[in-house]
Amino acid sequence: MAQVQYYGTGRRKSSVARVRLVPGDGRIVINDRDIRDYIPSEALIEVVKQPLVLTETLGNYDVLVNVKGGGFSGQAGAIRHGIARALLQVDPDYRPVLKRAGLLTRDARVKERKKYGLKGARRAPQFSKR
């Protein structure tokens, strides 16, 4: 018998996460490594688990993730987005809960480019009156 799997793709900053939910005991594996080995910060681990906690499905599914691009924060956000999208395939009734928490919305904030004549995106060189 083929095992049931649910897929979701999440994006944040320059990170892209391909998430697979498989019925299991709650393991989270990112790029073939345990979540605690991959993500250094406890706060970011909480970010990743947020959709599972809100829908009360934390111990019901194994989460298998392939993520690339960006840093830890962007990757954690992308994984969260992917898990939320995959949970919608599990049960469409989760939509209001996930939507209220803002987990289905792609966070469009990305780093603004540096402009010529300025020191950063908006920071101008120091101005001297005299």
From Swiss-Prot:
GO terms for molecular function: RNA binding; structural constituent of ribosome. GO terms for cellular component: cytosolic small ribosomal subunit. It comes from the Bacteria. The keyword Ribosomal protein applies. Keywords: Ribonucleoprotein, Ribosomal protein. GO terms for biological process: translation. Pfam families: Ribosomal_S9 (PF00380). PROSITE patterns: RIBOSOMAL_S9 (PS00360). Gene3D superfamilies: 3.30.230.10. Belongs to the universal ribosomal protein uS9 family. This is Small ribosomal subunit protein uS9.
